[in-house]
């Protein structure tokens, strides 16, 4: 009998979203006629926009011809998509990113989880609290976190509390972290950061030889001027930061699967003997070993997101979701809830009513309003007493959900 990776036994019982699904299933079985409105997990509801559909249809037709058939593609991504990403997502900001620094993948969740494989297992990890669970759980699996304590924190992680008192901006740790996870616009709090704050993080990383893992999956939802869209807007960030982007929420690709990661050539890691190693080369080796690339049809769809018509259609979808966010924010505020986020991100972070715990509030909304959200404590101990609602629902469902919640 083979021995197992015992680090998996250190994971908290049940990943957050399966636990939500389990509770909803139990309720549904007992109340089969109940209309449950789901504002929890961040899946999109609008269809793929016409420009993208048309591009994928044409690509599919190509695949049915001798001259247009594509088998295994380049693992890093087709050049036509890499160029579009470099030109539109970075060139438009005055940032020079080379095609060889971009790696197309099947999702930011995968990238955020897999990137830790190229770092030493004794690396010291710093995460915000609350935090997207994937950052923590994948490091638990790798054996970096130590044991979980009674307070829900792992002994070897550096936790950076993001609270109402500090504007949900995690403070730079006093100790040295080898790897720092940052996410802006933030999941779960829906808040954003400033360029000055990012400058301070870059300075910290340079001083401590740290690597920043910057999750910018929700960049397209930024609406206010002056909010940074990329950490590479900060001078010197290419020497210390890896950035993650996704088409999932931007263009509704949750069922298609396409994202990318940027690893600048300037970015280096070190061996135990002190030798510098290119992280771009290291990730390229990992990526080409474990991944066969995103399909040609999907990448042609992703390329169409950057066409003038594609951009216009996608902005219409984003505006739809952000109108939902405004409805949620305004409705909850009028009902007396303390609400954060939802301006530059599709998530609304609210204080639970009557000082209920996050899971008690979840049960209250499910049982009394038939509305499903996400308990804040599932994102970390500092999320206790908070709750996340997603703006990705249908307009009429969002309106009905808020009416139900505010009538409690």
From Swiss-Prot:
Pathway: Amino-acid biosynthesis; L-lysine biosynthesis via DAP pathway; LL-2,6-diaminopimelate from (S)-tetrahydrodipicolinate (aminotransferase route): step 1/1
InterPro entries: Aminotransferase_I/II_large, DapL/ALD1, PyrdxlP-dep_Trfase, PyrdxlP-dep_Trfase_major, PyrdxlP-dep_Trfase_small
Keyword S-adenosyl-L-methionine among record annotations: no
EC number, as in UniProt: 2.6.1.83
GO MF terms, alphabetically ordered: L,L-diaminopimelate aminotransferase activity; pyridoxal phosphate binding
Name by which UniProt lists this protein: LL-diaminopimelate aminotransferase
Species for this entry: Leptospira interrogans serogroup Icterohaemorrhagiae serovar copenhageni (strain Fiocruz L1-130)
Cofactor requirements of the protein: pyridoxal 5'-phosphate
């Amino acid at each position: 009998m083979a021995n197992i990776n015992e680090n998996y036994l250190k994971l908290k019982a049940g990943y957050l979203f399966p636990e939500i699904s389990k509770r909803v299933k139990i309720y549904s079985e007992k109340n089969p006629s109940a209309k449950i409105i789901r504002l929890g997990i961040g899946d999109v509801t609008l269809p793929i926009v016409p420009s993208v559909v048309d591009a994928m249809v044409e690509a599919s037709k190509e695949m049915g011809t001798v001259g247009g058939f594509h088998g295994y593609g380049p693992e890093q991504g087709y050049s036509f998509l890499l160029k579009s990403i470099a030109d539109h997502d970075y060139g438009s900001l005055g940032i020079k990113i080379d095609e060889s620094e971009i790696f197309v993948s099947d999702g930011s969740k995968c990238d955020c989880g897999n990137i830790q494989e190229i770092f030493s297992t004794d690396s010291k990890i710093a995460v915000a609290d609350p935090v997207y669970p994937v950052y923590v759980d994948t490091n638990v699996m790798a054996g970096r976190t130590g044991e979980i304590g009674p307070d829900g924190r792992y002994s070897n992680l550096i936790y950076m509390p993001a609270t109402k008192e500090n504007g949900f901006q995690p403070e730079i740790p006093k100790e040295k972290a080898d790897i720092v996870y940052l996410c802006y616009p933030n999941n779960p709090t829906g808040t954003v950061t400033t360029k000055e704050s990012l400058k301070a993080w870059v300075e910290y990383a340079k001083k401590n030889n740290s690597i920043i893992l910057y999750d910018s999956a929700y960049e397209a939802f930024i609406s206010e001027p002056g909010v940074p869209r990329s950490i590479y807007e900060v001078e010197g960030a290419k020497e210390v930061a890896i950035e993650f982007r996704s088409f999932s929420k931007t263009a509704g690709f949750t069922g298609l699967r396409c994202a990318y990661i940027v690893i600048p050539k300037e970015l280096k890691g070190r061996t135990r003997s002190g030798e510098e190693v290119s992280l771009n080369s290291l990730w390229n080796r990992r990526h080409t070993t474990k991944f066969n690339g995103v399909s040609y049809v999907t990448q042609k769809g992703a390329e169409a997101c950057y066409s003038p018509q594609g951009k216009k259609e996608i902005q219409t979808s984003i505006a739809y979701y952000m109108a939902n966010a405004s409805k949620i924010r305004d409705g909850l505020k009028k009902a007396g809830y303390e609400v954060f986020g939802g301006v530059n991100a599709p998530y609304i972070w609210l204080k639970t009513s009557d000082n209920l715990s996050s899971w008690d509030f979840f049960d209250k909304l499910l049982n009394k309003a038939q509305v499903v959200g996400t308990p804040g404590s599932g994102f970390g101990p500092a999320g206790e007493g908070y709750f996340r609602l997603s703006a990705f629902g249908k307009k009429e469902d969002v309106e009905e959900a808020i009416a139900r919640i505010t009538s409690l």
